[in-house]
Amino acid sequence: IAEQSQLPVFDRELDLPQAYRLQHEVSRFRANAEIGGIKAGVTNRKSQEYFQIDHALIGSLYADAKLPNNCKLPYVEGRLIECEAALLVNEEGAPVSIAPAIEFVLPKFARQSEMTASGLIACNLCAESYIVGAWQPWSASFNTAWVTLVCNGARANHAALEEALNGPEEAARWMWQEAGMRGFPLGDQTLFLTGACGRAVPAEIG
């Protein structure tokens, strides 16, 4: 994962609890135990229907994968760009700050048939890296905010934050509960990325 290489072939079927246990092992090994936050994936109804599940999934953010706003990345084939909301939540899981965020995901499955719900969980939802913008104090008005991604003056994505788990506030509530149930570390000022809004944009050279 750290080398952005193709994933190994999955040699057996996993149920979701088994996949989450494997994910924790993978994430700790990849991040040298330095986890920077929690991410949500498969956060809208259409994608859940595709993966034949009735809920979203969660994974870990690698602490060393947080990038500065002015970063330059080498091109990697298959990388996708997702527009998201970043939240800092308190010890009860309520949002206290919000920022725009970009997440880069890299689905590098050896076989397309392995891109299942359990496969996504096992590889930590294809997490690669992420950028978090300027923080602002939380307000319920952000539940109906929109995000826009612009590339070379053209709009590449424009979507409502409500597309991911019905908006940031509900996303925080669900992620806090799900993370606690799945054994993720939680505390005051935990970072959440609440899931893709709009389409995942293929990264291009330039």
Where are these regions (language model features)?
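Conserved metal-binding segment of the jelly-roll/cupin
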Residues: 186-203
